């Protein structure tokens, strides 16, 4: 995932992004939700 894509929404979705970057063990469903939230 590109950081440039996330930057604009990093503060809005900080909890989800923290989970993504710290654990890096998201399920496919969580990944889809994160993608939908950003886009």
Swiss-Prot record:
GO terms for molecular function: anthranilate phosphoribosyltransferase activity; metal ion binding. GO terms for biological process: L-tryptophan biosynthetic process. It catalyses: N-(5-phospho-beta-D-ribosyl)anthranilate + diphosphate = 5-phospho-alpha-D-ribose 1-diphosphate + anthranilate. Keywords: Amino-acid biosynthesis, Aromatic amino acid biosynthesis, Glycosyltransferase, Magnesium, Metal-binding, Transferase, Tryptophan biosynthesis. Its EC number is 2.4.2.18. Pathway: Amino-acid biosynthesis; L-tryptophan biosynthesis; L-tryptophan from chorismate: step 2/5. Catalyzes the transfer of the phosphoribosyl group of 5-phosphorylribose-1-pyrophosphate (PRPP) to anthranilate to yield N-(5'-phosphoribosyl)-anthranilate (PRA). Belongs to the anthranilate phosphoribosyltransferase family. Homodimer. This is Anthranilate phosphoribosyltransferase. It comes from Pectobacterium carotovorum.
